[in-house]
Amino acid sequence: MKMIRAIIRPEKSEEVADALDDAGFPALTKIDVIGRGKQKGIRFDEIYYDEIPKTMMLIVVDDADAERVVLVISESGYTGKIGDGKIFISPVENAYTVRTREEGL
């Protein structure tokens, strides 16, 4: 299994979630976060924002589905402007459902 963490623009979060659902990946967690990337914040005239609001999406999928999920997020979250986000993929050793105590996805 893989954990996909996508840091995206908040205004694209619904579009990305809908695209993932349409592609067969309805399960996700969304978290409002703030942070900065390589650009170290953003300046508008004389106002400087050190940290920028983003949305983090967490999705756990089978190994074979990871690249497809990355493609869906990349396409649906794209604006072409600085700050579109970043996607991270990590291995997941196991998953358990709390209610049923079932193991796996």
UniProtKB/Swiss-Prot annotation:
Describe the function of this protein.
Could be involved in the regulation of nitrogen fixation.
Q: What keywords appear on the UniProt entry?
A: Nitrogen fixation, Transcription, Transcription regulation
Q: Which PANTHER family match?
A: NITROGEN REGULATORY PROTEIN P-II, PII-LIKE PROTEIN GLNBI
Q: What is this protein called?
A: Nitrogen fixation nifHD region GlnB-like protein 1
Q: Which SMART domains match?
A: P-II
Q: Which family does it belong to?
A: Belongs to the P(II) protein family.
Q: Which GO terms describe its cellular component?
A: cytosol
- Could you list the residue ranges forming a coiled coil in this record? none
SUPFAM superfamilies hit by this protein: GlnB-like
**Family matches, as Pfam families:** P-II (PF00543)
The alphabetized list of GO BP terms reads: nitrogen fixation; regulation of nitrogen utilization
Return one GO MF term. Answer: enzyme regulator activity
